[in-house]
Amino acid sequence: MYTILDTICFGMAHLTPLPARRRAAGPVYQRLRDLIVRGRLGPGARVTEAQAAAELGVSRTPVREAMQRLVRDGLLVPANGEHGGRTRLVVAPMEVETLVQLYRLAGTLEGLAGRAVASLPRAARARLARRLSSAELAFRQAATAQPLDYDRLFQRHAAVHQAVIDACAGLELRAALEVIRPRVDRFEWYYAPLVGPDLRVTYREHEAIIRAVRRGTADSVERAMRANWFNGALRLARALAGRAGPLPGAT
């Protein structure tokens, strides 16, 4: 269990009013989701319609819709007990068991998608390998930049995996990945601050994916994709299990 100050459910520095044209539920959802994924709303922080609406400068209706979606995503959960006849919602805890399950599921799904490499025409497979190499280079550049921009690093890492999904995943696999994406992204955001800054093991695993794509064998791509996620889960689980107090960015 991670310790946070429950009184800090929203910080005025984190939320700014949305322009009138963006006051639908979608932008409200994205703003709240980003705050949770990036740890600015830490595990256990209480989220209320009234305060979120006031600080975002929107009505409570889009906030209510956004919060319902965040509950479906697993990012908001009911607090223990009731308050005033209504369930209080708090940011979901970050538990090692959940991390391992999510990463193994992501690895299994992306591994299944990667098997489709074998059915790609040779030219398409070569294009995918080039895209992966380019994405990996951008990821490494982001990882070694000074000062380190975690937003950019997160995006560049996601682009490596997205290349395989775009080229290989069918509609059903994409839909399944979207279901777990918000919670996976939340753990991914903490990966580099806790496991890094030395990401050479991750680089080697990405290199294995690229080599497997070039070979074009279904089994090798699936193994490489799964290994990257499964091993990443173990690395982050060890880091989370050994950490006390609030997570990076949670305050």
Which residues does each PLM region occupy?
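Short linear motifs at protein or domain termini
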Residues: 1-119, 238-251
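Short helix-capping and inter-helix turn/linker motifs at the boundaries of alpha-helical repeat units
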Residues: 23, 78, 151, 155, ...
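Amphipathic alpha-helical repeat elements characteristic of tetratricopeptide repeat
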Residues: 26, 96, 107, 129, ...
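A ubiquitous short alpha-helical element
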Residues: 94-99, 117-123, 143-148, 168-169, ...
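Conserved amphipathic alpha-helical segments that form helical-bundle/coiled-coil interaction surfaces
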Residues: 123-190, 202-211, 220-234
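Hydrophobic/aromatic-rich alpha-helical bundle segments in the mid-to-C-terminal region
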Residues: 195-196, 218-222
